[in-house]
Amino acid sequence: MASTRMAHISTATSSSSFPIHGLLPKQATKVESFREKFPNYDGRNVRVAVLDTGVDPAALGLDGPNKVVDIIDCSGAGDVKLQEVAAKFNADRSTLQLVSPTTKRTLLVDPSWPNPSGVWKVGTKRAYDLWPTSLVERRTRERKQAFDVSHSALFQKALDDLATYEANEGAEKPSDKNAAAQHHEDLKARVAVLKDLAKNWKDPGPVLEAVVFHDGVNWRAVVGGAEGDVVDPSQGEPAAYRHNVIDLRSKPRMTDYRLEREWSYFGEMDLLTFSVNIVGDGDVLSIVTLSGTHGTHVAGIIGAKTQDLSLIHI
């Protein structure tokens, strides 16, 4: 994923007339003479802590091996309390099913995942509680557009059903008048409820589900539920919004970032990078992500390095 993005940026830069050599002017700042005098003063064996809005390990120049060595959340915003839950096989024993204690959604996990203890822990987190404001605003707009399309179809049908009934009112037999009156009130109530729903719509955002287990060596976490598929809001809400099953079987099983330096995205719709740390004896999952862009900007100034864009390096 990162290599594809790198190739795209490299191609765009090489074919552009934008003067990237002026972004970090080496002559005016005497960097070239400094490097000639001290060729080994290039940051080797130096570790810098950036206490800021978070650092994106997928950012260009920071995604190399051993570049970002650890990422932690000092705010506690990404903490997810975990509860042990029972697991059961599906009918053909190809999938393990867990039930989220908070949302009651069914979570599907792969029984081939190493878990010698057989202990599965589950936690829930509102995505908007830890996503940056700019992303929340964008996803809210997109989700509102999808809602409006779906709502318009339902509202129009309710209006049509009411109009059809009222056009034929009086055709019912005397014995059916009570039932007909009740049906009429029901049709009017549907229109009123849908009208009120549009007026008072609020977006709670995606609800994340996390499963944590110990593979015999390390604690591992799998996170899902962030609407991973790219959808066109103009086509209305996807059916997946209403599903009560979260399939985690294809999600990465991540451990503490410092151990394997692995990160992922919540979903294709948000493309927000996150990593994890499991605290204590698997009691709390810390989902580590970004609250803004400044921390990544600072980290890039400190240590970003890309071979294809050497002109912009100090």
Q: Residues of each region from the PLM?
A:
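C-terminal substrate/ligand-recognition segments
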Residues: 299
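Conserved small/polar residues in nucleotide/adenosyl-binding loops
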Residues: 312-314
